């Protein structure tokens, strides 16, 4: 439950303050000041990355992201008791590949219905088409980022350990039909 996250955060802060926890030692963002109670903080960011399911195995990636680990807990259960979020809530979807989750469409719809995020971004390889994602793009309630990493199938296969560049490009064309400004395409350059 979300209350467990708050308790863990309290413990971490207490440990930092009394010197028994050094996980944040040396961090430039660590500041000494009077802070509001954690319970009074607004939740402004949710990053959905509780799995490592992926339909590719990119040469620059690690098995942390493509290792095939199913979600270890229910996000719907986690957010069950959470009703208040900040007005500037942003949701980021990653993983692994978010769209290969069996529950992606339902989870995407339920989190959007419950929280009405101000912005959200789905980091997808676009190898699998999602009607729910298409509808969110068409209604301008999400954006996507896709790393293509190649211009031809041979290079795509070498970098991604997967065929499907044409399929990815077709899906990106469909996704961008109504709101091309919400689609970011990037390339990651490697020495290979």
Where are these regions (language model features)?
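Acidic (Asp/Glu)-rich catalytic clusters
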Residues: 135-141, 176-177
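A generic structural signal for well-ordered alpha-helical segments enriched in polar/charged residues
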Residues: 113, 174-177
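Core AdoMet radical
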Residues: 43-53, 62-74, 86-101, 112-130, ...
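Generic structural signal for well-ordered alpha-helices
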Residues: 105-108, 134, 169-173
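Short amphipathic alpha-helix with an adjacent loop that forms part of the alpha/beta core around
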Residues: 78-84, 134-137
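N-terminal pre-core extensions flanking Radical SAM catalytic domains
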Residues: 1-68, 83-85
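Residues that form or flank phosphate/diphosphate-binding pockets in enzymes
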Residues: 34-35, 102, 131-132
């Amino acid at each position: 439950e979300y209350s467990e996250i708050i308790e863990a955060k309290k413990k971490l802060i207490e440990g930092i303050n009394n010197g028994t926890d050094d996980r944040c030692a040396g961090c430039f963002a660590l500041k000494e000041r009077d802070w509001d109670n954690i319970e009074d903080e607004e939740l402004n960011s949710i990053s959905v990355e509780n799995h490592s399911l992926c339909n590719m195995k990119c040469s620059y990636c690690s098995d942390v992201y493509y290792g095939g680990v199913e979600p270890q807990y229910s996000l719907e259960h986690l957010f069950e008791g959470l009703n208040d979020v900040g007005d500037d809530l942003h949701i980021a979807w990653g993983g692994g590949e978010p769209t290969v989750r069996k529950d992606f469409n339902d989870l995407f719809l339920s989190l959007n219905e419950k929280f009405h995020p101000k912005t959200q971004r789905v980091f997808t390889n676009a190898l699998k088409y999602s009607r729910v994602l298409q509808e969110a793009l068409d209604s301008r309630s999400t954006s996507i980022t896709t790393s293509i990493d190649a211009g031809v199938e041979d290079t795509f296969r070498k970098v991604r350990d997967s065929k499907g560049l044409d399929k990815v490009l077709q899906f990106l064309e469909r996704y961008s039909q109504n709101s091309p400004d919400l689609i970011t395409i990037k390339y990651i350059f490697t020495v290979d």
